[in-house]
């Protein structure tokens, strides 16, 4: 089998990069639609006087922030020269674990473990933003 030339490899990489960009653009548009639906859901939950709707409202707010963070991650990808900054994934992880604590707080041990995971992610975020590892 003949090895591929450098120009062919670059062509393949360009095609795959364009497919990735199109997929992320499509995902971003889908997330914007879900963000709009979540806005309507939050407006409905806001005006329901029941106690259960307050939990639904808080859960909806955290989900709203998750959609928002994923959209911000996609925007940052295109603005930073097709690169995903690590700290955005850490932000999304922290928000997802906070949502898990709010929604599923059955045992104190689970909450403690989730809190330890958040602490670990915050330490990771601090390390990523330190001068030694700072890229931007």
Curated annotation (Swiss-Prot):
Superkingdom of origin organism: Bacteria
Keyword Transmembrane helix part of the UniProt annotation: yes
Principal subcellular localization: membrane
Cysteine disulfide links: none
Example of a GO biological process term: cellular response to phosphate starvation
Topology relative to the membrane: Multi-pass membrane protein
Record's keyword annotation contains Membrane: yes
GO cellular component, one term: plasma membrane
Keywords: Cell inner membrane, Cell membrane, Membrane, Transmembrane, Transmembrane helix
Coiled-coil portions: none
Family (UniProt): Belongs to the PsiE family.
Protein name: Protein PsiE
Phylogenetic placement of the source organism: Bacteria, Pseudomonadati, Pseudomonadota, Gammaproteobacteria, Enterobacterales
